[in-house]
Amino acid sequence: MPQKIGVLALQGDFVKHQAMLQLLKIETILVKKPKDLHGCEGLIIPGGESTTLTKLIQKCNMYEPIREFTAKHPIMGTCAGAIMVASNVDDQRIEPLQLIDISVARNAYGRQIDSFVTHVDVPFLKGSERFKAVFIRAPQIRNIGSQVEVLMELHGNPIMVQESNILALTFHPELTSDPRIHRYFLEHFFTAQALL
């Protein structure tokens, strides 16, 4: 297990991710500047508002530092974070980091009023009960590259995907009391790193 995980803290529900990591006894660093990445062994890009997140990442000069960080460290993007790690987004106002070979549509399930909670199978966690997935103005993954693995689906649409050391989720695992998704991020990627 890693010692320190960064949570991008420019906008969005980063405090909820921090609380989930603390529940798992992981020290967190709230990342607001490039230098905050030093000492982090992984990074979570939280949900929020992707056009605002684009502007803030630009303003804080975080694009290249985050891209360089992925050369050695895993990243998990949730909701707007999934939009930010995508290769392509259906909105020209967004400048994605292009870390995972997926195309994403913003707010694909509708407006805030159309947000919903549902229980979803977790096939990559053997014998696990269903996960309570919270979708808030959620994006939808429309296309995936040949190296992208689909870990969870809802009505045939990918909602959690992985490529190399990048994990993208269209829902909010931090808004539940269930730590399984965060634990997977910590255990899967850091066990794999240890084997290299």
Language-model region placement:
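Short coil/turn connectors at secondary-structure junctions
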Residues: 2, 40, 71-73, 94-95, ...
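Hydrophobic anchor at the start of a short beta-strand
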Residues: 28-29, 75, 166
